[in-house]
Amino acid sequence: MRSLEHFAAENAKSARAFLSAVGMPRPLQQIEIVEIASAKAELLKPLRQGHSLGVVSEAGCPAIADPGAAVIEAAHREGFRVVPLVGPSSIVLALMASGLEGQRFAFCGYLPRGGAERKKRIGELERRSQREKQTEIFIETPYRNDVLLAALVEACNPGTRLCVAADLTLPSESVQTKPIAEWRRAKAAIGRRPAVFLLQATA
Protein backbone atom coordinates (compact mmCIF):
# COMPACT_ATOMS: atom_id res chain seq x y z
CA MET A 1 0.00 0.00 0.00
CA ARG A 2 2.82 2.39 0.84
CA SER A 3 3.96 2.38 -2.78
CA LEU A 4 0.60 3.49 -4.19
CA GLU A 5 -0.13 6.91 -5.62
CA HIS A 6 -3.83 6.45 -6.43
CA PHE A 7 -6.70 5.59 -4.08
CA ALA A 8 -10.49 5.27 -4.19
CA ALA A 9 -12.24 6.25 -0.97
CA GLU A 10 -15.66 7.14 0.38
CA ASN A 11 -14.32 10.42 1.79
CA ALA A 12 -11.11 12.02 0.51
CA LYS A 13 -10.47 14.09 3.66
CA SER A 14 -10.61 11.18 6.09
CA ALA A 15 -8.68 8.98 3.65
CA ARG A 16 -5.85 11.55 3.59
CA ALA A 17 -5.86 11.63 7.39
CA PHE A 18 -5.57 7.82 7.47
CA LEU A 19 -2.75 7.76 4.91
CA SER A 20 -0.92 10.44 6.89
CA ALA A 21 -1.36 8.44 10.12
CA VAL A 22 0.12 5.27 8.61
CA GLY A 23 3.16 7.20 7.43
CA MET A 24 2.97 7.14 3.66
CA PRO A 25 6.53 7.71 2.38
CA ARG A 26 5.53 10.19 -0.33
CA PRO A 27 3.99 13.66 0.26
CA LEU A 28 0.19 13.58 0.39
CA GLN A 29 0.12 16.24 -2.33
CA GLN A 30 1.43 13.59 -4.72
CA ILE A 31 -1.35 11.13 -3.87
CA GLU A 32 -4.58 11.21 -5.88
CA ILE A 33 -7.78 10.21 -4.06
CA VAL A 34 -10.99 9.73 -6.04
CA GLU A 35 -14.25 9.66 -4.07
CA ILE A 36 -16.28 6.56 -4.90
CA ALA A 37 -19.76 8.14 -5.05
CA SER A 38 -18.92 11.32 -6.94
CA ALA A 39 -16.72 10.07 -9.75
CA LYS A 40 -17.75 6.59 -10.85
CA ALA A 41 -16.62 7.23 -14.43
CA GLU A 42 -13.15 8.17 -13.17
CA LEU A 43 -12.68 5.37 -10.63
CA LEU A 44 -10.68 2.99 -12.82
CA LYS A 45 -8.81 5.65 -14.78
CA PRO A 46 -5.51 4.99 -12.94
CA LEU A 47 -5.78 1.27 -13.72
CA ARG A 48 -6.45 1.96 -17.38
CA GLN A 49 -3.32 4.13 -17.42
CA GLY A 50 -1.19 1.32 -15.99
CA HIS A 51 -1.12 2.40 -12.33
CA SER A 52 -2.21 0.47 -9.25
CA LEU A 53 -5.25 1.65 -7.29
CA GLY A 54 -5.86 1.19 -3.57
CA VAL A 55 -9.32 1.10 -1.97
CA VAL A 56 -9.60 2.75 1.45
CA SER A 57 -12.61 2.10 3.70
CA GLU A 58 -14.20 4.85 5.77
CA ALA A 59 -14.62 2.35 8.61
CA GLY A 60 -14.13 -1.38 8.75
CA CYS A 61 -12.82 -3.69 6.06
CA PRO A 62 -12.79 -2.43 2.45
CA ALA A 63 -15.58 -3.82 0.24
CA ILE A 64 -17.27 -5.75 3.11
CA ALA A 65 -20.61 -3.99 3.74
CA ASP A 66 -18.77 -1.02 2.25
CA PRO A 67 -19.10 1.16 -0.90
CA GLY A 68 -15.65 -0.03 -1.99
CA ALA A 69 -17.33 -3.20 -3.29
CA ALA A 70 -18.40 -1.21 -6.37
CA VAL A 71 -14.75 -0.51 -7.21
CA ILE A 72 -13.81 -4.17 -6.87
CA GLU A 73 -16.73 -5.26 -9.04
CA ALA A 74 -15.79 -2.74 -11.74
CA ALA A 75 -12.15 -3.86 -11.67
CA HIS A 76 -13.13 -7.50 -12.18
CA ARG A 77 -15.52 -6.52 -14.95
CA GLU A 78 -12.67 -4.85 -16.85
CA GLY A 79 -10.25 -7.70 -16.18
CA PHE A 80 -7.91 -6.02 -13.70
CA ARG A 81 -6.16 -8.08 -11.02
CA VAL A 82 -7.51 -7.59 -7.49
CA VAL A 83 -5.17 -8.18 -4.52
CA PRO A 84 -6.63 -8.20 -0.96
CA LEU A 85 -4.27 -6.92 1.73
CA VAL A 86 -4.02 -8.34 5.23
CA GLY A 87 -5.96 -6.35 7.80
CA PRO A 88 -8.52 -6.67 10.60
CA SER A 89 -12.18 -7.42 9.88
CA SER A 90 -14.58 -6.68 12.72
CA ILE A 91 -16.87 -9.44 11.45
CA VAL A 92 -14.20 -12.13 11.74
CA LEU A 93 -12.77 -10.72 14.98
CA ALA A 94 -16.23 -10.73 16.55
CA LEU A 95 -16.84 -14.33 15.50
CA MET A 96 -13.43 -15.35 16.85
CA ALA A 97 -14.21 -13.83 20.25
CA SER A 98 -17.88 -14.83 20.46
CA GLY A 99 -17.64 -18.52 21.32
CA LEU A 100 -20.44 -19.17 18.83
CA GLU A 101 -20.46 -21.60 15.89
CA GLY A 102 -17.42 -20.81 13.74
CA GLN A 103 -17.76 -23.60 11.18
CA ARG A 104 -21.08 -22.43 9.75
CA PHE A 105 -21.96 -18.74 9.76
CA ALA A 106 -23.57 -16.08 7.57
CA PHE A 107 -23.03 -12.32 7.41
CA CYS A 108 -26.38 -10.61 6.86
CA GLY A 109 -25.34 -6.95 6.68
CA TYR A 110 -27.87 -4.47 8.04
CA LEU A 111 -31.32 -5.49 9.25
CA PRO A 112 -34.43 -3.51 8.18
CA ARG A 113 -34.99 -0.23 10.03
CA GLY A 114 -38.76 -0.52 10.35
CA GLY A 115 -39.96 -2.14 13.57
CA ALA A 116 -42.27 -4.73 12.01
CA GLU A 117 -39.86 -5.61 9.19
CA ARG A 118 -36.95 -5.82 11.62
CA LYS A 119 -38.88 -8.11 13.98
CA LYS A 120 -39.82 -10.36 11.06
CA ARG A 121 -36.20 -10.53 9.87
CA ILE A 122 -34.93 -11.33 13.37
CA GLY A 123 -37.40 -14.22 13.53
CA GLU A 124 -36.24 -15.49 10.14
CA LEU A 125 -32.58 -15.36 11.18
CA GLU A 126 -33.25 -17.08 14.50
CA ARG A 127 -35.14 -19.89 12.76
CA ARG A 128 -32.42 -20.25 10.13
CA SER A 129 -29.75 -20.36 12.81
CA GLN A 130 -31.61 -23.17 14.55
CA ARG A 131 -32.30 -25.06 11.32
CA GLU A 132 -28.80 -24.74 9.84
CA LYS A 133 -26.97 -24.76 13.20
CA GLN A 134 -25.11 -21.62 12.19
CA THR A 135 -24.20 -18.21 13.56
CA GLU A 136 -25.99 -15.20 12.07
CA ILE A 137 -23.88 -12.02 11.98
CA PHE A 138 -25.14 -8.49 11.36
CA ILE A 139 -24.27 -4.86 12.00
CA GLU A 140 -26.04 -1.57 12.65
CA THR A 141 -25.32 2.14 12.41
CA PRO A 142 -23.95 3.05 15.88
CA TYR A 143 -26.72 5.46 16.82
CA ARG A 144 -29.28 2.66 16.31
CA ASN A 145 -27.37 0.02 18.31
CA ASP A 146 -29.57 0.17 21.38
CA VAL A 147 -32.77 0.05 19.31
CA LEU A 148 -31.54 -3.13 17.62
CA LEU A 149 -30.42 -4.67 20.91
CA ALA A 150 -33.84 -3.99 22.43
CA ALA A 151 -35.53 -5.56 19.39
CA LEU A 152 -33.35 -8.67 19.64
CA VAL A 153 -33.96 -9.04 23.37
CA GLU A 154 -37.71 -8.71 22.83
CA ALA A 155 -38.05 -10.96 19.78
CA CYS A 156 -35.65 -13.86 20.40
CA ASN A 157 -36.20 -16.99 22.47
CA PRO A 158 -34.71 -16.94 26.00
CA GLY A 159 -32.17 -19.66 25.19
CA THR A 160 -30.84 -18.08 22.00
CA ARG A 161 -27.29 -16.85 22.50
CA LEU A 162 -26.43 -13.30 21.49
CA CYS A 163 -22.97 -11.78 21.27
CA VAL A 164 -22.40 -8.04 21.09
CA ALA A 165 -18.84 -7.10 20.13
CA ALA A 166 -18.19 -3.35 20.40
CA ASP A 167 -15.14 -1.13 19.83
CA LEU A 168 -13.07 -4.04 18.52
CA THR A 169 -9.28 -3.40 18.56
CA LEU A 170 -9.76 -0.32 20.78
CA PRO A 171 -8.86 -0.01 24.49
CA SER A 172 -12.61 0.19 25.21
CA GLU A 173 -13.27 -3.13 23.43
CA SER A 174 -16.14 -5.18 24.85
CA VAL A 175 -17.29 -8.66 23.78
CA GLN A 176 -20.20 -10.23 25.66
CA THR A 177 -21.97 -13.49 24.80
CA LYS A 178 -24.93 -14.68 26.85
CA PRO A 179 -28.44 -16.09 26.44
CA ILE A 180 -31.25 -13.68 25.63
CA ALA A 181 -32.72 -14.34 29.09
CA GLU A 182 -29.58 -12.85 30.66
CA TRP A 183 -29.58 -9.88 28.28
CA ARG A 184 -33.15 -9.18 29.41
CA ARG A 185 -32.14 -9.14 33.07
CA ALA A 186 -29.05 -7.03 32.42
CA LYS A 187 -30.89 -4.22 30.59
CA ALA A 188 -27.60 -3.41 28.87
CA ALA A 189 -26.88 -0.46 26.58
CA ILE A 190 -24.18 -0.31 23.90
CA GLY A 191 -24.29 3.37 23.08
CA ARG A 192 -22.94 4.84 19.86
CA ARG A 193 -19.99 2.50 19.45
CA PRO A 194 -19.19 0.46 16.34
CA ALA A 195 -20.64 -2.97 17.10
CA VAL A 196 -21.17 -6.40 15.57
CA PHE A 197 -24.12 -8.59 16.58
CA LEU A 198 -23.94 -12.40 16.44
CA LEU A 199 -26.85 -14.72 17.11
CA GLN A 200 -27.01 -18.49 17.55
CA ALA A 201 -30.29 -20.24 18.30
CA THR A 202 -30.42 -23.36 20.42
CA ALA A 203 -31.74 -26.64 19.03
Tell what function each PLM region has:
Residues 61, 65, 111, 115, ...:
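Conserved phosphate/pyrophosphate-binding and hydrolysis machinery centered on Walker-type P-loop NTPases
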Residues 2-85:
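Class I S-adenosyl-L-methionine
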